[in-house]
């Protein structure tokens, strides 16, 4: 039979009635909300009525809340925001609205991310063993405080954007070594957090979070070989107006690439993948709606993608934490609220319970055609169709 006809039949063989996953998390990280409230900020619905931010997230279609956890931000100079008491307070409010909860442990006094993994001031000078004990105790203390309130987190991130490790320098990935050996110190720190989570909440899903989906294929083989434990791969994905508009010139926009990488990671490592952070320029809410809708369409077409979380959507591009002035930082510009304190169109995709999903998607990356069909990744190469694992489809 003609190979082109075979390819067409292959695409059409999937039911055209594909729908969004019923368990797909639609979430928001609103960790700044208490600091904003203390600063006098209020939040309003489309009618202009003042609404509690957690209730407003519910009205906006969110099903889950993500909260970051810092060790001792007051010692760092930031104040008490995102410390244990603040986190528990916000978790109670989320629980009262019926949200699923994700905790995001940074194991730092301030933001830990791709370029910064500072050890908490109270932990500096610790031996590796003492650091593992501190990670365990910190994790357990927060989780036990939630347990005392009758709150069970569904997901727990052990570290934030840990592409290069965590709690530097003791938990950094050692790039002077090769293979699993370079991950050993980081894995010891990470596993201390993982086991603390499972000790308090055995059913909670532990996430290892990277700064981008493209990193999973080089990161997780050595992480696993070094004994790293995890249940879900988490990624950050921030598309931009600049790269989106460049598609008119023939470029592949990042949602296409991210969908392929998510499907590949899920197939390779056999675990779900979560978009733990996304956002788009607050100044372009109409385009944000288009781009985030496209992201939903692509990710809900992958059964192994567990959800999407918008990072600090309640910001408007003007408000910034007081401490940012000390650092010389500008306001975060990827929120999804207007300067009137109301949600913009950027959050509309979260309000749609059944975002239509494509039953297959096509993209060209690395000079081969990739097909996400019925949520599974296939490769078209030299007229033949292969699974993500390399087996030829007859």
Map each language-model feature to its residues.
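Active-site beta-loop-alpha junctions enriched in small/polar residues
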Residues: 31-33, 70-72, 106-110, 158-163, ...
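Glycoside hydrolase catalytic-domain groove-lining segments
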Residues: 47, 51-54, 58, 205, ...
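C-terminal outer-membrane/trafficking sorting elements
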Residues: 355-394
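Substrate-binding cleft and catalytic face of glycoside hydrolase catalytic domains
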Residues: 56-205, 211
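Sec-dependent N-terminal signal peptides
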Residues: 4-14
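Hydrophobic faces of well-ordered beta-strands that scaffold small-molecule active sites
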Residues: 25-30, 65-67, 101-105, 154-158, ...
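Boundary/entry segment of secreted carbohydrate-active catalytic domains
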Residues: 21-56
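Aromatic-rich peripheral "rim/lid" segments of glycoside hydrolase catalytic domains that contact
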Residues: 175, 285-298, 302-358
């Amino acid at each position: 039979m003609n190979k082109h006809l075979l390819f067409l039949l292959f695409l059409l063989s999937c039911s055209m009635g594909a729908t969004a996953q019923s368990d797909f998390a639609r979430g928001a990280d609103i960790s700044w909300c208490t600091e904003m409230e203390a600063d006098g900020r209020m939040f309003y619905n489309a009618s202009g009525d003042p609404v509690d931010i957690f209730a407003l997230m519910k009205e906006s279609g969110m099903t889950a809340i993500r909260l970051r956890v810092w060790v001792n931000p007051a010692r760092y100079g930031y104040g008490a925001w995102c410390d244990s008491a603040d986190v528990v307070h916000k978790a109670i409010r989320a629980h009262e609205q019926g949200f699923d909860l994700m905790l995001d442990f940074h194991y730092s006094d301030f933001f830990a991310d791709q370029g910064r993994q500072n050890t908490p001031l109270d932990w500096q000078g610790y031996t590796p063993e003492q650091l593992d004990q501190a990670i365990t105790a910190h994790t357990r203390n927060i989780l036990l405080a939630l347990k005392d309130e009758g709150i069970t987190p569904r997901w727990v991130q052990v570290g934030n954007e840990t592409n290069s490790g965590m709690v530097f320098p003791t938990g950094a990935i050692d790039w002077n070594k090769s293979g699993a050996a370079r991950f050993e110190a980081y894995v010891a720190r990470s596993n201390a957090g993982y086991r603390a989570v499972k000790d308090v909440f055995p059913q909670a899903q532990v996430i290892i979070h990277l700064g981008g989906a493209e990193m999973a294929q080089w990161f997780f083989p050595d992480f696993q070989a070094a004994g790293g434990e995890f249940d879900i791969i988490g990624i950050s994905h921030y598309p931009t107006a600049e790269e989106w508009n460049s598609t008119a010139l023939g470029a592949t926009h990042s949602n296409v690439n991210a969908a392929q990488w998510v499907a590949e990671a899920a197939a390779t490592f056999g675990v779900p993948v979560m978009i733990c952070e996304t956002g788009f320029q607050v100044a372009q809410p109409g385009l944000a709606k288009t781009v985030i809708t496209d992201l939903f369409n692509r990710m809900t077409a992958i059964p192994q993608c567990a959800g999407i979380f918008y990072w600090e959507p309640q910001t408007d591009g003007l408000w910034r934490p007081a401490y940012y002035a000390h650092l010389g930082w500008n306001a975060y510009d990827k929120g999804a609220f207007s300067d009137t304190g109301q949600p913009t169109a950027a959050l509309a995709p979260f309000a749609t319970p059944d975002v239509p999903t494509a039953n297959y998607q096509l993209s060209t990356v690395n000079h081969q055609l990739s097909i996400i069909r019925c949520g599974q990744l296939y490769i078209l190469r030299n007229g033949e169709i292969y699974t993500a694992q390399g087996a030829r489809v007859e």
